[in-house]
Amino acid sequence: MQIKKINNKQKRIRNFSIIAHVDHGKSTLADRILEITNTVEKRLMQKQFLDSMDLEKERGITIKLNAVQIIFNDKKGDEYIMHLIDTPGHVDFNYEVSRALAACEGVILVIDATQGIQAQTLTNFYLAIENNLLIIPVINKIDLPNADVNKVRREIKDTLGIEPENTILVSGKTGVGVTEILEKVVSNIPSPRGDINEPFQSLVFDSFFDPYKGVVSLIRVFSGKIQKGDQIRFMSNNEVYEVSEVGVYSPFQTPKPFLFVGEVGYLSASIKNIDKVRVGDTITNHKNPTKQRLPGYRKIQPVVFCGLYPITCSKYETLKSALEKLKLNDASLTFEPETSVALGLGFRIGFLGLLHMEIIQERISREFDIEAITTAPSVIYHVYTKKGTKILVDNPSKWPNTQIIERVEEPFIKATIICPQIYIGTVMTLSQSKRGQLKDISYLDKNIAMIIYFFPLSEIMYNYFDKLKSVTKGYASFEYEIDSYRSSSLQKMDILLNGEVIDALSIIIHKDFAYSRGKVICSKLIECIPKQMFEVPIQVAIGKRVIVRENIKSMRKDVISKCYGGDVSRKKKLLSKQKEGKKKMKNLGKVKLPQKAFLAILSTE
């Protein structure tokens, strides 16, 4: 293709993302765009088309960003190439959103007409501003009977500073207003910059492993062009490969002769070593390289950690391989090997939040058919010793001896809660029970309040969001960011079973909650652990001090059932013999902890 034709095509490219709070209708709107532009045949169309995982469809949420090329003819009859990137809405997947925005020039900000601006709406709005993207505000779900368009328009003006006449009214369900959005994309979002004559330069914004093609990278081309047979170089590690295929998603993988400046597509180079490809890396032409790398992405730090152990030891290598493949597809995931006395070999895994943790566990089970035991989630604590050294603790097993600790700091988050004004009291009661510190209350309008709280991250890990939804009848939205580390009265709490510490059940806890949590854990374990032939004590200890003890009663065989009357000394002898046997069993016996016991601990508060 001649350079002049490519330049003309480049002027007709539009790259944009759809961003919104979770459940505001992003994926449904994306479905209507695909349908109206005939990108997907009607016989193939299904709900949440771009959500490729079964898990996404079941939960009704987007977990992974997805890119698709659309051909749109505007009202003048001119043809435009659009690259739509659908993004997640949950706070745990903000990293996915930031990666998608780096490949775009504009965004469609979707706001639910029934719920208005919510916490993640604000986060995504500011994320788009940070990336200097043009924002097209859209009010969705206008077909619902409880839609309040005027109220939402006022919120948009007061909170985001966008004039009401600049918003587009849309129904992702019926398709009303969708063509108007696409016309706005054409007229308002600029075409991508870059020069076809410059050396090839592209950003890897996602990747996944294909069993036949090896590592497939999703790229945005910022200059030059790439085609099959070209030699490419990854600029972070200088690895060189030959391109075996390039193409776009429209919406399925469609090979093309080449990708040129401004396009969003995929690149395969028969890369089998997963470690060689990094999200955020710059790819260039090996023979005619670009001089500098693209900014890429800041490395994101995990905030929640847990241990993951295969139920059978033989699955350890399989679990390791599964985690490597998931990390390729999810750059925010971290893991390292660890060993537990109770559970054997496993991994310490870092996540961006509890939903992220839950999703990864589900994917390991479904996609790789691996059954695994999960330990209680933890965060990174800063432990300062009396000698002045600082120890980072992400696992209770690394907790130092109490005698050498001077102070402990834990991560606090800044949480934004948006809810109807009538629920402020119940939200504050719940938040204070989680050691929350109120910072500010403001009002988006006379009925909607925005509450700012500081929480210890460890406290919101246990059912806070579920309880928040419950006390506000589902109307509250919650979003958070890591704030700072603060001093806290924290202790390591051990669980002993028959006198032995079960290291996988140890947790770090605030001293004010140790006794109550210990009582709950003991009760749960009594329900889960089957009775033995001997009495099994369950103890909760802080250091060497036992603060809670419960016993699992032993099973009892009626050894005197065959004694009919006669001398009582015969019965005493049999009972004494049984007692000695049980004492010996207690000293030698081992109690096997079932998997449901670990799950029960996770469900406690």
Swiss-Prot record:
Family matches, as PANTHER family: TRANSLATION FACTOR GUF1 HOMOLOG, CHLOROPLASTIC, TRANSLATION FACTOR GUF1-RELATED
SUPFAM superfamilies from the xrefs?
EF-G C-terminal domain-like (SSF54980), P-loop containing nucleoside triphosphate hydrolases (SSF52540), Translation proteins (SSF50447)
Question: What keywords are annotated for this sequence in UniProt?
Answer: Cell membrane, GTP-binding, Hydrolase, Membrane, Nucleotide-binding, Protein biosynthesis
Single GO molecular function: GTP binding
| InterPro entries the record matches | EF-4, EFG_III/V, EFG_V-like, EFTu-like_2, G_TR_CS, LepA_C_sf, LepA_CTD, LepA_IV
Q: What is this protein called?
A: Elongation factor 4
User: In what residue span(s) does the tr-type G domain sit?
Assistant: 11-193
Task: Tell me the superkingdom of the source.
Answer: Bacteria
Q: What class of enzyme is it?
A: hydrolase
What is the phylogenetic placement of the source species in the record?
Answer: Bacteria, Bacillati, Mycoplasmatota, Mollicutes, Acholeplasmatales
Catalytic reaction(s) noted: GTP + H2O = GDP + phosphate + H(+)
Biological process per Gene Ontology, one example term: positive regulation of translation
As for membrane topology, the entry says: Peripheral membrane protein
Q: What is its EC number?
A: 3.6.5.n1
Q: What does this protein do?
A: Required for accurate and efficient protein synthesis under certain stress conditions. May act as a fidelity factor of the translation reaction, by catalyzing a one-codon backward translocation of tRNAs on improperly translocated ribosomes. Back-translocation proceeds from a post-translocation (POST) complex to a pre-translocation (PRE) complex, thus giving elongation factor G a second chance to translocate the tRNAs correctly. Binds to ribosomes in a GTP-dependent manner.
Family membership, please give it: Belongs to the TRAFAC class translation factor GTPase superfamily. Classic translation factor GTPase family. LepA subfamily.
By its UniProt entry, which SMART domains does this protein fall under? EFG_C (SM00838)
Q: Which GO terms describe its cellular component?
A: plasma membrane
Please state the protein's primary subcellular location.
membrane
Compartments, as annotated in UniProt? Cell membrane
The entry marks the following residues as binding GTP, namely: D23, H24, G25, K26, S27, T28, N140, K141, I142, D143
